[in-house]
Amino acid sequence: MDKTIEPVNFNASKELTDHIGEIFDKLVKYNDRIVSADIYLKSLRETPTRDKKIEVRIFLPGKDVFVEQEADSFISAAQQAFDRCKILVIKEKEKSATH
């Protein structure tokens, strides 16, 4: 699976982007038809808590999956977004298997 990890309006460390990439690499275990993923990291300054946001778009043949998640850290937001993406890509795999 190809993936793009893009920090928006800040510079992310290589360790952070590598770790987030490793989290989302696991998605192909749940749906082998995933073409690619775009992951955007945003730092929200308007709220004192839950100020890190991740937006994930998973590209599947015929349908894309989009998830947004906010948390206190990017790693926490990434893990929560991964959990939601996992459920959605499994559902899409089951739908495509029945058609």
Name what the model sees in each region.
Residues 1-99:
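N-terminal, polar/charged subdomain of small-to-medium soluble alpha/beta proteins
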